[in-house]
Design a protein with these regions (language model features):
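Intrinsically disordered, metal-sensing/regulatory segments
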Residues: 1-257
Length: 257
């Protein structure tokens, strides 16, 4: 994320402890998805739209602007040899991320239609293929939780709130597609992935160009997954919930980041 020089050591240590608390929170969100009942069919739950609005606001107001900073950092490291054709490469990668997640979602849904009467309507191999994209998702989010140079504990807290909201939506989407298989395996895989990302960040600082690619693909995936859900049989109630979630996170981002 942003690089802030001259931060006090005590603040950095506090943020690391806070990130540990939040990584545990992410894991609880994934495990708790088995026990929370929300409507994914029509009428869709008010909460899905609220969480979707919160996530998309965070992406547009925080993640996408960060791509510019990473792009400038990568470009300055390369120097004059940087090809002008790649001046928008971070946004191109975000588009590629959207396309990848769209394709994987279509694949999973096409496999589900093969046998609608099976309670575990998609097989374990299909779940694992689909889940691989969300493993990348979670590893990136876990890494940024500790390596993102947030300016304060509140800044980090806004990140946790927005991404927790998104995890709730994606967990229920995966449950809709993969039924009992997700409860049996998926939530374990997602919990492990976000923890692994955090551990990588605790032990290593990845090169800027790798982080920029990861955030770009993540932004594309978030865009697809949020709007895919909002375009399903939504009502004005869902719309106003979406606007409310977006407004709250937008206000928090503007105040604390």
């Amino acid at each position: 994320m942003k690089i802030y020089h001259g931060r006090k050591r005590g603040l950095i240590i506090m943020d690391h402890w806070l990130s540990l608390i939040f990584i545990i929170g992410f894991i609880i969100v994934h495990f708790g998805s088995k026990y929370v009942k929300l409507s994914v069919a029509s009428p869709r739950s008010f909460w899905f739209s609220l969480f979707g609005g919160a996530t998309i606001a965070y992406m547009f107001l925080f993640l996408l602007p960060e791509l510019n900073q990473y792009f400038e950092a990568v470009k300055s490291n390369v120097g004059d040899s940087w090809p002008s054709i790649l001046d928008n490469y971070t946004y191109l990668l975000a588009l590629i991320g959207l396309i990848i997640y769209f394709g994987m979602d279509l694949y999973a849904r096409s496999r589900k239609d093969v046998d609608e009467e099976d309670p575990d309507s998609t097989s374990e191999p299909v779940l694992l293929v689909h889940m691989s994209t969300f493993v990348f998702y979670n590893v990136t989010i876990g890494y940024l939780l500790i390596r993102g140079e947030f300016i304060s504990g509140m800044d980090l807290t806004v990140y946790f709130i927005a991404l927790s909201a998104h995890f709730i939506v994606t967990d229920f989407t995966l449950k809709e597609l993969h039924s009992g298989v997700h409860d049996k395996y998926g939530r374990w895989i997602l919990s492990a992935a976000v923890l692994i990302g955090w551990l990588i960040g605790a032990l290593y600082e990845l090169p800027t160009w790798i982080v920029s690619i990861a955030i770009s693909l993540l932004a594309g995936g978030i865009t697809f997954n949020v709007f895919k859900e909002e375009l399903k049989e939504s009502t004005f109630k869902n719309y106003f919930a979406f606007v409310g979630g977006a407004f709250v996170i937008a206000a928090l981002v503007m105040v604390f980041t």
